[in-house]
């Protein structure tokens, strides 16, 4: 399963949630699959989807899911310590781990080698951390959304690879305005 197939499998699950999606191809793929006004597409801030989603979950009570990539999380690992110590129960971080920087040419990340994002998240204080293959991601997200006592970090292991998608035809101001 690649990232596009994974995002497609989540189509019905995300509709009632506030979704913050990682820059580049993940946002473009999600837009192509099922554009919704409750989806906030990151257009140029690698590594910040998890931070923005965390802030949003603290500021209000709706369920928030940040969709981030392994490369972005590695770039902003300090956010895992904040998630581990401050994330409210309405927050879920989905890390799509394809072992590569998919939006910049599929260069390998260190999750292809010795770095375990599950161990990093647990070490950062995250209490509910699930690592699964892409096919099991939807079920694990449902579990997280139904748990009213914990925030979750879900690491979905998938194959690298990109599909050809058009850029998102929305400017940042329009994305923000319709997300409100």
Where are the predicted features?
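Long, charge-dense
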Residues: 96-107
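Glycine-rich beta-alpha junction loops
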Residues: 23-27, 98-100, 157-162
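Active-site diphosphate/adenylate-binding microenvironment
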Residues: 1-46
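Glycine/aspartate-rich loop-and-adjacent alpha/beta segment that forms the canonical ThDP
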Residues: 36, 147-180
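Short acidic, glycine/serine/threonine-rich loops at helix termini
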Residues: 31-33, 105-108, 164-169
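Thiamine diphosphate
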Residues: 29-97
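Generic beta-sheet signal
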Residues: 17-19, 62-66, 91, 148-156
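Conserved thiamine diphosphate
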Residues: 108-143
């Amino acid at each position: 399963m690649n990232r596009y197939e994974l995002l497609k499998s989540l189509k019905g699950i995300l509709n009632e949630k506030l979704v913050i999606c990682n820059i580049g191809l993940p946002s473009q793929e999600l837009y192509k699959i099922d554009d919704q006004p409750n989806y906030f597409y990151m257009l140029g801030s690698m590594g910040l989807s998890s931070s923005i989603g965390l802030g949003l979950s603290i500021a209000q009570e709706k369920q928030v899911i940040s969709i981030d990539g392994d490369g972005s999380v590695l770039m902003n690992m300090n956010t895992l310590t904040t998630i581990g110590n401050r994330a409210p129960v309405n927050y879920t971080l989905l890390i799509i781990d394809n072992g590569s920087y998919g939006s910049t040419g599929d260069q390998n990340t260190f999750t292809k080698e010795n770095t375990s994002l599950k161990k990093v998240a647990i070490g950062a204080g995250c209490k509910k951390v699930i690592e699964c293959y892409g096919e099991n991601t939807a079920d694990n997200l449902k579990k997280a959304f139904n748990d009213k006592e914990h925030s979750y970090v879900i690491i979905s292991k998938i194959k690298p690879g990109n599909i050809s998608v058009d850029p998102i035809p929305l400017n940042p101001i329009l994305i923000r305005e319709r997300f409100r």
